Amino acid sequence: KMNSSSVQKQLKAAGIDTNSKKYKAALSEMMKNGNGAMFTNVQAIKNLMSQYDKNGDWIDPNTGLTGLAVTDENRNSYKHIISIPESSREEMFELAKKEFLNENGTLNGDTTKRESVYNNLYRKMDKDDRLSAGWTMEQYEHQYRQAFAEAAKVEDPTWRAGKPIPAGALDGITRESVESGRKSVDIKL
């Protein structure tokens, strides 16, 4: 048992503060994964504790940031639009446009650089806003790609994803025009 005096002595001897939020978060994760029946050792506990900060928040191994875990507590509350930096929206707009042109309107998970745009955004946001910021960025990204597809269809009504984008089709589209609801697409007569 984790709370037996002999186990507690071993943990303390190993330098583990059993009152810390970090320890409690690791123990909670172990209990959840082990359904309460745990067979473990001190090193396994230390390894798991290294995945949490002093506040007991999970540290994303790719970014080193907290606030990026979807949990039972936040699962239904992070999907709302929040204010995100204009520089991040601009970075996503430029990348989405470049990738839309390079991939003929398809999404290519092998070549995209989207993750770096999201990671840059997360670094600019407070921990408690990171999930909502990511969700907000997804909404902007979808809006940008939709505007690009509509512009390609204005130039060539038969265009569909995978076909070459008509030359100049995206030239008149700005991030500001998409975000304000105006696509700023000139229709050639």
Model features per residue range: what roles?
Residues K1-L189:
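Type III/flagellar secretion export determinants
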